[in-house]
Amino acid sequence: MGVKTISKLKKELDKWFSLYIRLKLSTPEGIVSCCTCGKLGHYKVGMQNGHFQSRRHHSTRWNEQNCAVQCIACNCFSQGEQYKMSIYIDNKYGKGTAESLEMEARKIVKMSRIDYEEKITYYKSIVNKLKLEKNIE
């Protein structure tokens, strides 16, 4: 097997990070709630890792405070419900957090292959640990 491209590493990191966000917020049965509309669903079915600041900003793409569970309707068809998500973020992490994330998103970040590999290893291990703790697949 050859060396993975940065593009493939980014995609793999997205996968593990998304699973982490959804699993950490799930019940032991795997149920999560959309942070913007409250809809309930299984973390694997119709629920996604929504980003307050767009994924195009690498400085906040894998920032846990920038992400929360969203249903497909809110995340895709309602452009992420950014205003509602900002309220959720400020309620969860403290007033001004959403504004700080907006500033952070403007920073230019260049990740190396090692950065991606380390983050993949980190989130993959946490996902596996959460699955064991919650006894879900």
Region annotations inferred by a language model:
Residues 39-42, 67-94:
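Short Cys/His-centered divalent metal-binding micro-motifs
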Residues 55-67, 91-105:
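Short microdomains enriched in Cys/His and/or Lys/Arg
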Residues 5, 9, 59, 77:
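Conserved aromatic-histidine-acidic binding/catalytic patches
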Residues 1-33, 109-114:
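Short, charged surface segments at domain edges that flank catalytic/cofactor-binding sites
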Residues 100-137:
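Short flanking/linker segments adjacent to small metal-binding domains or redox-active Cys/His motifs
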Residues 2-6, 52-55, 71:
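Short, flexible active-site loops
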Residues 33-66:
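Histidine-centered nuclease catalytic patch
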